[in-house]
From Swiss-Prot:
Pfam family, one: HMG_box_2
Protein family: Belongs to the maelstrom family.
Protein name stated in the entry: Protein maelstrom homolog
Compartments, record wording: Cytoplasm; Nucleus
Annotated spans, Disordered: 49-72, 360-421, 439-465
Annotated Polar residues bias: 360-370, 393-421, 439-449
InterPro entries: HMG_box_dom, HMG_box_dom_sf, Maelstrom, Protein_maelstrom
Organism: Culex quinquefasciatus (Southern house mosquito)
SUPFAM superfamilies according to UniProt: HMG-box
Main location: cytoplasm
Role of this protein: Plays a central role during gametogenesis by repressing transposable elements and preventing their mobilization, which is essential for the germline integrity. Probably acts via the piRNA metabolic process, which mediates the repression of transposable elements during meiosis by forming complexes composed of piRNAs and Piwi proteins and governs the repression of transposons.
GO MF term (any one): sequence-specific DNA binding
Gene label: mael
Biased composition (Basic and acidic residues): 379-388, 451-464
GO biological process annotation, one example: regulation of miRNA-mediated gene silencing
Length: 512
């Protein structure tokens, strides 16, 4: 078995490069790989005096003399040829960086809460769109959006910039076109929209942060947790393309900020905790209930009807979700367009609606006695009505008949029982409440079902004579189903010869 080649010993520059990398990352700078670290650390190494290089020379000698302790020879490697010690060191550093970020967010919110200024805490949300990712891991920018936000004022200010990178990395045109068509739908270079001068873009960003004095201090900006590498790469690319390399951006996770802010507002206004973990904050942001809100995207995406993928719309929607969850805990009334969309209903809208309804109800008058009497009168069951006070007869069968007003006489029952007498009070004003007319030229007989409940009750109240009953028993009825026996003509109850008439039918028989 051939012997495994030993890796080359680490020189003084390697240890200086690792130290330089740690210092830059602690300041918020992110490197894409060791090649970039080597390129950045080289000029600084050349400027070091011999006595400044001595500590690194000693570390290189120690690494060569005792490689196992120094992480040199005899060490295990990953499949990519990376030492396990380096992998573990990077993982430990990431955990340390995450702890520092968490500590920074918690201290920021706790300080504002202790000073009773949680509503005045101003933060910045940022989101970006990109065309493609190069082979070195660099993101080619397409759009950048930043908003200024606080619980009291909601969305205070916004900045939206479309970025034109002019050129794409070699071989990335198809990737850029595919990604653009499936997300933000912005034209790809060389037809891209927006600003191509990166220095001008950076000055707009610094002006938005109110940082024009050359200071390195820039407020922390929050973005979606998984988008931190993308946002960091885009901002770093803008910085590298300009001479304003003194600025250091600090990009923090939005979900962690939302979770800690919600805990602080609950401590202020609630006794019961409703946020058990950070996963609930993530779920609320991922649900994105304001995704299709109109009027919060940039003009280009409004014309494309693709508001969901707009970077400006995205950061505004984050602000709406946080406001909807936290403002009521601290008693902050939400305003349309700042805390919620313009078409949302706020508490003040509900209060105004209730006040208007109460005012309108107070103006209503009670029903007059005359109207009450009209409402209490029974409606006639007949389909022909007459206005007693006029000469007009309103009929649903014969239309309108004009004549002299006459006295309404209730119809008396015939010898065979007759109909019930009309004993109700007549309405002298409304023709639609008139009683049954005793004399009507256009009146036609009404057919009734002899087997109905109404007819049975009539027979009980007005029993038939023995002769008519015997004749009814002799009347044969042919057919199947339900038969209808109408024993009524223009003079009242039917005669014997009418009752004996036989009608043969199929289905439901009718005997007239």
């Amino acid at each position: 078995m051939p012997k495994k080649n030993k890796p080359a010993a680490k020189g003084p520059f390697y240890f200086f490069m690792m130290e330089f990398k740690e210092q830059e990352e602690a300041a918020g700078y992110r490197f894409s790989g060791l090649a970039e670290v080597t390129e950045k650390a080289g000029p600084h190494w050349e400027k070091l005096a011999p006595h400044e290089r001595e500590p690194y020379n000693q570390r290189a000698k120690q690494n060569k003399a005792n490689p196992k302790e120094a992480g040199g020879y005899g060490e295990r490697y990953t499949a990519q040829g990376k030492p396990f010690s380096q992998v573990q060191a990077e993982a430990a550093k990431r955990r340390q960086l995450e702890e520092q970020i968490q500590k920074r967010i918690v201290e920021m919110i706790q300080t504002a809460s202790a000073n009773n200024a949680l509503g005045e805490l101003e933060v910045y949300f940022v989101s970006c769109n990109y065309f493609c990712v190069s082979l070195s891991g660099e993101y080619v920018p397409a759009e950048l959006a930043i908003i200024k936000y606080s619980l009291n004022d909601g969305v205070m200010d916004s900045l939206n910039v479309l970025i034109n990178p002019t050129d794409l990395p070699l071989g990335m045109a198809l990737d850029a076109k595919t990604h653009s068509s499936s997300t933000h739908q912005l034209p790809v270079p060389p037809d891209a929209l927006g600003e191509a001068n990166y220095e001008k873009i950076l000055r707009q960003i610094l002006k938005f942060f109110k940082n024009t004095s050359g200071s390195k201090v820039v407020p922390p900006i929050f973005t979606w947790n998984k988008d931190i590498p993308m946002v960091d790469s885009i901002l770093r690319g803008i910085l590298e393309a300009t001479d304003l390399d003194y600025v250091k951006f600090s990009i923090l996770p939005l979900i962690d900020f939302f979770y800690n802010l919600k805990l602080a507002t609950e401590d202020y206004g609630l006794d019961i905790k409703t946020f058990p973990s950070i996963h609930l904050a993530k779920a609320l942001l991922e649900k994105d209930v304001y995704a299709y809100t109109a009027g919060i995207a940039c003009d280009v995406h409004e014309q494309l009807n693709n508001q969901v993928a707009c970077a400006l719309s995205r950061v505004v929607r984050w602000a709406y979700v946080i406001s909807d969850s936290c403002c009521l805990d601290v008693g902050i009334e939400m305003e349309k367009g700042r805390h919620l969309p313009h078409n949302m209903t706020t508490l003040s809208d509900i209060t105004g609606t209730v006040s208007a309804l109460s005012s309108r109800m107070s103006k209503l008058t009670t029903t007059s006695d005359n109207n009450r009497s009209k409402m209490s009168r029974p409606r006639s069951t007949d389909r022909t009505d007459r206005d007693v006070t006029t000469t007009t007869i309103y009929s649903s069968r014969a239309g309108t008949v004009t004549g002299k007003p006459s006295t309404i006489v209730p119809q008396q029952p015939a010898s065979s029982g007759g109909t019930r007498a009309a004993n109700d009070t007549f309405n002298t004003t409304n023709p639609f409440y008139a009683m049954q007319m005793a004399q009507s030229a256009n009146r036609s007989p009404t057919k009734k079902n002899p087997w109905s409940r109404e007819n049975k009750l009539t027979e009980v109240r007005d029993p038939q004579s023995d002769t008519e009953t015997s004749m009814l028993m002799l009347a044969p009825v042919a057919g199947r189903g339900r038969g209808t026996l109408a024993r009524m003509n223009a003079a009242g109850r039917g005669r014997a010869q009418d009752l004996c008439t036989t009608v043969k039918t199929v289905g439901r028989g009718h005997l007239n």
